[in-house]
């Protein structure tokens, strides 16, 4: 059945209902009404009822979690919509923001801060004007249509989440077949780098999926650097993986092959495509022990 309407609660908006409605708005392009659902809404599979109504029934497109018991898994409305789209497991694996969003909505800020191993004050400091403005503008509306700027932004957010998750698996398979691992000798432990060759197949976003790939391969503790095509120029980007302090690319900023090296040392852009030269640049970027 074709979806005709999205209904979510009135009043203050939270990240989970905003993102859940963003996904549904992108997928279906239908109006969003902020009000209590009727019994007819809950019984109508053409109406998505989000974060309100006291019912979770994917067949009827009811996506509320507030009726779940205190010891239930920390699923929010966003989780339930992602499950319905078949994207939840990949989102958990590759969207590091999802689990904290679930915790925040179901457990509250104090417990979320504990689980994230940060202070309550630090959690609050992570709020940005983007969060506050979008949630405030969304919460102030009674109905949103395709001509609403807020609705249009929501569709962009939903589109980016869906496209990221649906294309990531394809990119991971590509990386599995095409990456190389380099070992760069140093005075101490060698540096391990992941190298991805230039190709038209990845020209639009060459570095997409590399971090996720390293994690899925279980190589987080082995890789120190990444070498990948530079989408802004005809060369390569060199960057630290997980901000590995064994590399400082500002050390190579004066090299003739280097177009740009960040003063903080975490990334450089180079013109050479020669693999021998690329390995030499990595070696030159290795931080030597003082003395």
Segments predicted by a language model, with ranges:
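Short, low-complexity, polar/charged sequence segments that are solvent-exposed and flexible
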Residues: 25-27, 66-69, 80-82, 255-259
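A basic- and aromatic-enriched beta-loop-alpha substructure that forms the phosphate/nucleotide-
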Residues: 47-132
